[in-house]
């Protein structure tokens, strides 16, 4: 099971690292962080579907404006992905998170 933590407020440089250390036991396959001036996300990963770096989180969309951290499994993600690809969406990896 992955670990997800976040905050809203003024950026504190050490806060995301503290969050990931506290939840590190939940995600042995990697960790990631994202922040801007007003919010931050910390994610530790238990990789199930896409074991490559392309499945790392927090994940950004192609514009970089939408940031996502997700724990779960979308059982029909292959069908959803195929529908999106027919509409012209280009994927960078093979994770179900990217389909969101």
List PLM regions with ranges:
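N-terminus-centric sequence/structural signature that marks the extreme N-terminus
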Residues: 1-100
């Amino acid at each position: 099971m992955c670990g997800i933590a976040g905050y809203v407020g003024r950026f504190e440089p050490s806060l995301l690292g503290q969050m990931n250390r506290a939840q590190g036991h939940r995600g042995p396959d990697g960790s990631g962080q994202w922040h801007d001036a007003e919010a931050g996300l910390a994610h530790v990963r238990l990789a199930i579907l896409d074991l490559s770096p392309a499945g790392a989180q927090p994940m950004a969309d192609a514009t970089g404006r939408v940031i996502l951290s997700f724990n779960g499994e979308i059982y029909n993600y292959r069908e959803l992905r195929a529908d999106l690809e027919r509409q012209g969406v280009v994927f960078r990896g093979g994770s179900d998170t990217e389909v969101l």
